């Protein structure tokens, strides 16, 4: 099977592979720029990109906005003619500011989930930045596109369907994960059908990008044959030389086993997937003291949470991978080495071409 370019409105990536946004600090300009320069779409996570800034503890919003703008511009430089996206979580208290900063910096695309991105069309109106909601089902996709059409007279430039095998927070209720996994491939066709009325109304193609558990070229080929136009992959890109995380974080993936990976407790009210390390097991039975609040998530029940997710993710990206939260996709245990981004992409393309 030969890979076709991924077209998102008037943008074109030579490869239909989006590197997923991973925070805190896992996918910044180094990784996103490398992926974009190889023909994919590199994605910067807007979740605390300024965690290394000197004023982050005292002025987290200013530090994050400054760092986000820096990383978008740096990634675009590295990308040459490639495309750079930013992943912004709707759940963030600073959602509007982060989207605007991404647009001002020249991001080609905003990918937005962890909630319904109802205001995204208005925030990007009149700019060259394209918009793509993350959805967990055809029902959610229909709801978002219907509301965008009704409220903003606009539609998506692409749609990302993220299945239950993804890493990080999942857009599913805990009791629905197994059922959603069983219906994952059938849901692709349903989402494509839910997009069609808006393609016709707005006279444009709205490509579906499939994410969640996509590991190999075989996986890529399977979803493309079902009608998807591209894939989004996060976990594979962690184990690359260019990934912005610490070597200790990358090696946590390399050293993981299938039994190590499972659902982990999160204070944001959604199930998450990661490595069930000492930390993950501990917080199931006791709470970690909250040493700092960054006021990052709107619905965070601060008095009742088992731990601060920002603090834990910052600890893990810096290398404390046994006593902090390490998110990963369901197939992370298959990774056995760290490779250059270019080599990984060449491997994936070669595998697809054999299908």
What are these regions (language model features)?
Residues 26, 214-215:
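Residue-level detector of alpha-helix initiation sites
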Residues 18, 166-209, 215-355:
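Conserved active-site-proximal phosphate/metal-binding subdomains
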Residues 1-201:
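Active-site entrance/lid segments in N-terminal catalytic domains of soluble metabolic enzymes
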């Amino acid at each position: 099977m030969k890979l076709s370019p991924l077209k998102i409105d008037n943008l074109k990536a030579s490869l239909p592979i989006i590197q997923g946004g991973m925070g805190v600090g896992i996918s910044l300009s180094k990784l996103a720029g490398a992926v974009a320069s190889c023909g994919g779409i590199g994605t910067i996570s807007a979740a605390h990109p300024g965690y290394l800034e000197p004023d982050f503890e005292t002025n987290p919003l200013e530090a994050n906005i400054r760092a986000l703008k820096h990383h978008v511009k740096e990634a675009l430089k590295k990308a040459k003619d490639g495309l750079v996206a930013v992943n912004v979580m709707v759940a963030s208290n600073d959602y509007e500011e982060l989207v605007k900063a991404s647009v001002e910096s020249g991001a080609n695309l905003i990918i937005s989930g962890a909630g319904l991105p109802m205001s995204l069309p208005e925030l990007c109106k009149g700019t060259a930045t394209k918009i793509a909601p993350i959805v967990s089902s055809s029902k959610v996709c229909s709801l978002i596109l219907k509301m965008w059409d009704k409220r903003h007279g606009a539609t998506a430039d692409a749609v990302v369907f993220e299945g239950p095998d993804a890493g990080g927070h999942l857009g599913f209720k805990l009791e629905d994960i197994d059922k959603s996994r069983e219906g994952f491939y059938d849901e692709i066709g349903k989402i494509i059908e839910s997009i069609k009325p808006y393609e016709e109304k707005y006279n444009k193609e709205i490509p579906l990008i499939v994410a969640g558990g996509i590991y190999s070229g075989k996986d890529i080929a399977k979803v493309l044959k079902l009608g998807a136009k591209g894939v989004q992959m996060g976990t594979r890109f962690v184990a690359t030389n260019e990934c912005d995380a610490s070597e200790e974080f990358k090696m946590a993936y390399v050293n993981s086993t299938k039994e190590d990976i499972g659902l982990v407790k999160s204070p944001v009210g959604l199930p998450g997937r990661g490595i069930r390390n000492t930390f993950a097991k501990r917080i199931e039975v006791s709470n970690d003291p909250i040493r700092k609040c960054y006021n990052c998530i709107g619905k965070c029940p601060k008095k009742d949470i088992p731990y601060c997710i920002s603090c834990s993710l910052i600890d893990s990206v810096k290398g404390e991978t046994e006593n902090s939260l390490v998110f990963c996709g369901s197939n992370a245990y298959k990774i056995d080495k760290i490779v250059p981004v270019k080599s990984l992409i060449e491997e994936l393309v070669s595998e697809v071409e054999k299908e």
